[in-house]
């Protein structure tokens, strides 16, 4: 009953208003406000400050600076196995598997459209049909910067407006098409393993999503926006494996998509498996160059 009431509340709460108010609080620089908030957060969520570059909670200029804190060098070593697909962030696996009949598994009894997740464009979604997906949920205590699982060159970024339901286990089980309904930023890369999509999904209390190349992408612009990065007028944006690509100012979810027969997820990973950025999420099955060579034979 408690879970059902929580799901029902998600439909009636003013999501964007709550998130924008939270964003204002998170940017407050008044010492007594931000220090009280940060210290409560560290204590309540048991945040390990020993791995942060700045260990003293009150040394941050505001809550958002604390929340997107950098870690000490070496805190997240990158798996050096050839062909390893890295976890893009800290968190827990929500789901991972195969994209079947154009749909991505969300929770028992629920799935969502890969095409809708990517902004409703058939051509954009086509390379991922029959491919692989991994959904990683970032809890409040986690490190909230997002990194590249493989090296890639940015081709397109799409801001997709939407609701901002919470994205915990309860709502995943109770809100149909959750991740394809929430506000999100879709980033498409060309990699040696073929096309890769990284989708940063917003949620209630997520005040904003940023990328390293565009800065602030949300709060909402109320309409779908597409930004091309493969045009002659723009300098190519290439990010190396393990490099930061974006961050959440208050938590949420990252969804990775690869094309068919490109990656194999690690067998030991499943729903609720804890993960850290830089660990192996899986292994590349075949490189794009090798695939093209096979097709030419």
Curated annotation (Swiss-Prot):
Active site residues of this protein: 90 (charge relay system), 147 (charge relay system), 252 (charge relay system), 252 (schiff-base intermediate with substrate)
Keyword Acyltransferase in annotation: no
Pyruvic acid (Ser): residues carrying this PTM: 252
Pathway annotation from the record: Phospholipid metabolism; phosphatidylethanolamine biosynthesis; phosphatidylethanolamine from CDP-diacylglycerol: step 2/2
Cofactor: pyruvate
Coiled coil: none
Record text on cofactor binding: Binds 1 pyruvoyl group covalently per subunit.
EC top class, as a word: lyase
InterPro entries the record matches: PS_Dcarbxylase, PSD-B, PSD_type1_pro
GO CC term, one of those recorded: plasma membrane
Origin: domain of life: Bacteria
Cleavage (non-hydrolytic) (site feature) positions: 251-252
Catalytic activity field: a 1,2-diacyl-sn-glycero-3-phospho-L-serine + H(+) = a 1,2-diacyl-sn-glycero-3-phosphoethanolamine + CO2
Record PTM text: Is synthesized initially as an inactive proenzyme. Formation of the active enzyme involves a self-maturation process in which the active site pyruvoyl group is generated from an internal serine residue via an autocatalytic post-translational modification. Two non-identical subunits are generated from the proenzyme in this reaction, and the pyruvate is formed at the N-terminus of the alpha chain, which is derived from the carboxyl end of the proenzyme.
Membrane topology: Peripheral membrane protein
NCBIfam families: PS_decarb
Function: Catalyzes the formation of phosphatidylethanolamine (PtdEtn) from phosphatidylserine (PtdSer).
UniProt cross-references to PANTHER family, sorted A to Z: PHOSPHATIDYLSERINE DECARBOXYLASE (PTHR10067), PHOSPHATIDYLSERINE DECARBOXYLASE PROENZYME, MITOCHONDRIAL (PTHR10067:SF6)
Subunit field text: Heterodimer of a large membrane-associated beta subunit and a small pyruvoyl-containing alpha subunit.
Record-given protein name: Phosphatidylserine decarboxylase proenzyme
């Amino acid at each position: 009953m408690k879970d059902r009431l929580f799901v029902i509340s998600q439909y009636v709460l003013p999501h964007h208003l709550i998130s924008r108010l939270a964003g204002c609080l998170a940017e407050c620089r008044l010492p007594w406000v931000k220090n009280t908030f940060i210290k409560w957060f560290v204590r309540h969520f048991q945040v390990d400050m020993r791995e942060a570059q700045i260990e003293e909670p009150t040394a941050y200029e505001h809550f958002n600076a604390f929340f997107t804190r950098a870690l000490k060098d070496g805190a997240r070593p990158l798996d050096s196995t050839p062909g390893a697909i890295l976890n893009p962030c800290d968190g827990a696996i929500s789901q991972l598997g195969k994209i079947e009949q154009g749909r991505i598994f969300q929770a028992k009894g629920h799935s969502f459209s890969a095409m809708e997740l990517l902004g409703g464009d058939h051509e954009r979604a086509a390379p991922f049909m029959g491919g692989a997906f991994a959904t990683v949920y970032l809890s409040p205590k986690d490190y909230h910067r997002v990194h590249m699982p493989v090296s890639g060159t940015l081709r397109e970024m799409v801001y997709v407006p939407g609701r901002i339901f919470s994205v915990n286990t309860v709502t995943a089980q109770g809100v149909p098409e959750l991740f394809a309904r929430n506000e999100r930023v879709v980033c498409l890369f060309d990699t040696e393993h073929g096309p890769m999509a990284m989708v940063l999904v917003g949620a209630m209390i997520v005040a904003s999503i940023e990328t390293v190349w565009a800065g602030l992408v949300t709060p909402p612009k109320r309409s779908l926006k597409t930004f091309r990065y493969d045009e002659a007028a723009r300098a190519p944006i290439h990010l190396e494996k393990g490099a930061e690509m974006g961050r959440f100012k208050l938590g949420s979810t990252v969804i990775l998509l690869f094309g068919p027969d490109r990656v194999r997820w690690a067998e030991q990973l499943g729903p609720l498996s804890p993960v850290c950025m830089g660990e192996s999420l899986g292994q590349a099955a075949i490189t794009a160059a090798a695939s093209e060579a096979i097709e030419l034979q």
